[in-house]
């Protein structure tokens, strides 16, 4: 029937038009104006999407040439979203697609001009300070252990109280700095800014803290593919580490670990259900 065919065709065209309209409505214009180092004059810069964090999966949206220390990008994209500007040497400079004119200073590694990019700049400065301090602390640990074999280190930790005190002090400082990374990420758990911070420092978080963060964070954070991939990587790393430790354990150590896990489970039940009665190993309440 010709009329039925025409009706189906019109419906199909209408559905296609609606789909395009819906997709287009999620897209908004962005404008980026930037300053670059003199060394980048006449060189290409690439505007990329981070994707899931894997370099091989970065999506190149556009490219431009630096002229007299300046460059620009413009277009339409779903917002907000994380993007990076990448030079020909592979150096990257993060920003967030957002309404308004985004300013980027590659020479100073700064971005701003819009609320989310201003926030990202503040957060990255904070994270960079923590990372710089961690680098200094890890360098102190390296210097303390340089030329030392594992057997010698183990012996010093048991028998050399001065060495043990120095090591414990540095380790405590390093763990506090790792905790600062976690706090920095948690402060942005309801923003796409936190997604980028998590991509930089998420693997430093203890896995238990990471699981709590995923429960507390907004869907913008917890359901982001970049975040979920990092959580899965951390989970796999934890499983590998536990398997390696278990393989190295003596039967006595395994039995002790089992008892400890059972005790931890009873404590957790007691915390959740204060009136609950838990059987002991003899079966008594």
Model-derived features with residue positions:
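Short active-site neighborhood of thiol/selenol oxidoreductases, capturing the structured segment around
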Residues: 284-285
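Amphipathic alpha-helices of TPR/Sel1-like and other helical repeat/solenoid scaffolds
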Residues: 173-184, 209-220
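Amphipathic alpha-helical repeat scaffolds of TPR domains
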Residues: 189-200
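Serine-centered coil/turn micro-motif
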Residues: 114, 118-121, 191, 221-228
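A non-transmembrane, solvent-exposed segment enriched in polar/low-complexity residues
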Residues: 26-182
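Bacterial Sec-dependent N-terminal signal peptides
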Residues: 1-34
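N-proximal helix/coil linker or "cap" segments that precede and/or mark the start of modular domains
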Residues: 213-281
């Amino acid at each position: 029937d010709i009329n039925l065919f025409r009706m189906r065709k019109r419906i199909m065209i209408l559905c296609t038009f609606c789909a395009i309209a819906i997709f287009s409505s999620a897209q908004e214009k962005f404008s980026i104006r930037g300053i670059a180092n003199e060394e980048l004059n006449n060189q290409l810069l690439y505007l990329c999407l981070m994707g899931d964090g894997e370099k091989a999966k970065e999506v190149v949206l556009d490219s431009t040439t630096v002229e007299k220390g300046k460059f620009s990008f413009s277009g339409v994209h779903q917002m907000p979203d994380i993007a990076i500007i990448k030079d020909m040497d592979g150096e990257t400079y993060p920003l967030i697609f957002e309404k308004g004119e985004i300013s980027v200073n590659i020479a100073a590694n700064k971005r701003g001009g819009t609320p989310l990019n201003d926030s990202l700049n503040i957060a990255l400065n904070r994270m960079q300070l923590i990372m710089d301090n961690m680098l200094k602390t890890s360098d102190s640990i390296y210097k303390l252990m340089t030329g030392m074999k594992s057997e010698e280190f183990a012996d010093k930790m048991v028998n050399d109280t001065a060495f043990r005190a120095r090591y414990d002090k540095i380790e405590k400082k390093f763990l506090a700095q790792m905790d600062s990374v976690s706090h920095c990420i948690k402060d942005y758990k309801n923003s796409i800014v936190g997604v980028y911070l998590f991509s930089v420092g998420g693997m430093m978080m203890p896995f238990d803290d990471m699981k709590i963060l995923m429960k507390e964070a907004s869907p913008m954070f917890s359901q982001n593919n970049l975040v979920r991939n990092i959580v899965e990587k951390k989970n796999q790393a934890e499983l590998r580490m536990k398997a390696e430790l278990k393989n190295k354990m003596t039967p006595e150590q395994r039995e002790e670990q089992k008892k400890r896990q059972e005790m931890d489970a009873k404590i957790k039940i007691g915390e959740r259900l204060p009136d609950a009665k838990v059987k002991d190993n003899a079966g008594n309440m």
